[in-house]
């Protein structure tokens, strides 16, 4: 798919059960692209193969971006494990290369932060890798601030960058 086509016709919606396989593929492809494979990375999370079920109840939401029947990526929010009830985590925000640079990351972020506020969260936390510069740029553009150490108990010991945003 041409990146300009993705920009023109991509739409966002909540994840559906039939998206699970395609979203798992996106996660695995992007994590592998950035060398984030193995223990300590979200690629190993059990929810990767069942994203719809993982984000369909409680105070969580997951959104996918798609165009012309192709799932380009997604992002979600959920309570941060091991943290206060008012803290959510931005989780599994990944876009395939053909979905990048078209504003889809910004649209996904806006949707996730709106959902976080609607669900009553007051702080959004995320974990990433220092070398994921485009992602870090997006997070900074939204006002996320670096932390010196992780928050909560995500189990993602492979991440080396932690950020928060007051909602």
Model-derived features: where do they sit?
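C-terminal "cap" of GNAT-fold acetyltransferases
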Residues: 8, 29, 122-125, 129-167
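Acetyl-CoA-dependent GNAT
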Residues: 7-97, 109-111, 115, 150-152, ...
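Short acidic N-proximal helix/loop "leader" segments that mark the beginning
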Residues: 1-3
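Residues forming the Rossmann-fold NAD(P)(H) cofactor-binding site
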Residues: 102, 106, 110
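Short coil/turn segments at alpha/beta junctions that flank glycine-rich nucleotide-binding fingerprints
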Residues: 37, 102, 118-122
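Active-site acidic-Proline motif in GNAT/NAT acetyltransferases
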Residues: 96-98, 102, 130-131
């Amino acid at each position: 798919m041409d990146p300009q086509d993705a920009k023109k016709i991509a739409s966002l919606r909540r994840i559906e059960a039939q998206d699970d396989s395609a979203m798992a593929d996106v996660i695995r492809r992007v994590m592998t692209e950035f060398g984030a494979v193995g223990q300590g990375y979200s690629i190993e999370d059990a929810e990767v193969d069942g994203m719809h079920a993982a984000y369909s109840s409680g105070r969580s939401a997951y959104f996918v971006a798609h165009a012309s029947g192709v799932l380009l990526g997604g992002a979600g929010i959920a309570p941060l494990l091991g943290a206060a009830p008012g803290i959510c985590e931005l989780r599994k925000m990944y876009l395939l290369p053909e979905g990048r640079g078209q504003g889809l990351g910004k649209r996904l972020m806006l949707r996730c932060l709106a959902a976080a506020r609607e669900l009553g969260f007051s702080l959004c936390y995320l974990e990433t890798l220092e070398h994921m510069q485009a992602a870090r740029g997006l997070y900074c553009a939204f006002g996320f601030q670096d932390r010196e150490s992780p928050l909560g108990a995500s189990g993602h010991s492979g991440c080396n960058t932690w950020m928060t945003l007051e909602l």
